[in-house]
Amino acid sequence: MARLLQASCLLSLLLAGFLPQSRGQDKSKMDCHGGVSGTIYEYGALTIDGEEYIPFKQYIGKYVLFVNVASYUGLTGQYIELNALQEELAPFGLVLLGFPCNQFGKQEPGENSEILPSLKYVRPGGGFVPNFQLFEKGDVNGEKEQKFYTFLKNSCPPTSELLGTSDRLFWEPMKVHDIRWNFEKFLVGPDGIPVMRWHHRTTISNVKMDILSYMRRQAALGVKRK
């Protein structure tokens, strides 16, 4: 009996290594702060092949979804759903942007040149190719975090009160607004101002419903202005 209990505990620990356990304090979505100073259009990033710097101002008038991604995470399957989301909502002005990061459980260990082949042949595999732009691997938290992520995080409250298990988080210093895990999402409106932030466990179907609801509100406001 003792051995069975020990094995059960070990299994739980191993499974926990792939994805942080859910907490009662988690919220699926948070609305961003009003009166934010600046816009995302002040920033930009290098594409995953390092060949092009894309200024985010090229997305003026678009709804832009920022996602920090990883190839060896329990949530890597979200890539398939994100492709579907991009395809479905692109006609309405949605643009997805993916930012590989290795700060959560060391789940994006490869070089930039290895990430797309890994997605194609390993996880999700089956010839998968993202239909949205991926950028160079970089930090989203800590001393060397990318500046646009500083802007996004300062614009939106966190979706969880707790950061998680410190031995699986690889950055310093840790701050209350930090991203908690792979596949957190931020939506930026057509004016470049952050609108919503989603917990990494929030389903893509719920993210889609939230985005569509926001798009409808924006459309209604546009009609009223006319």
From Swiss-Prot:
Active site: U73
One matching Pfam family: GSHPx
Keywords of the record: Oxidoreductase, Peroxidase, Secreted, Selenocysteine, Signal
Family, similarity comment: Belongs to the glutathione peroxidase family.
Catalytic activity: 2 glutathione + H2O2 = glutathione disulfide + 2 H2O; tert-butyl hydroperoxide + 2 glutathione = tert-butanol + glutathione disulfide + H2O
CC annotations in GO: extracellular space
Subcellular location: Secreted
UniProt tissue specificity: Expressed intensively in the kidney and adrenal gland, and weakly in the cerebellum, heart, and lung. Secreted in plasma.
Signal peptide annotation: 1-24
Domain of life: Eukaryota
The protein's Enzyme Commission number: 1.11.1.9
InterPro entries, A to Z: Glutathione_peroxidase (IPR000889), GPX_AS (IPR029759), GPX_CS (IPR029760), Thioredoxin-like_sf (IPR036249)
PANTHER family for the chain: GLUTATHIONE PEROXIDASE, GLUTATHIONE PEROXIDASE 3
Gene Ontology molecular function, alphabetical: glutathione peroxidase activity; identical protein binding; selenium binding
Quaternary organization: Homotetramer.
One Gene Ontology term from the biological process aspect of the record: hydrogen peroxide catabolic process
Biological function: Protects cells and enzymes from oxidative damage, by catalyzing the reduction of hydrogen peroxide, lipid peroxides and organic hydroperoxide, by glutathione.
Protein name in UniProt: Glutathione peroxidase 3
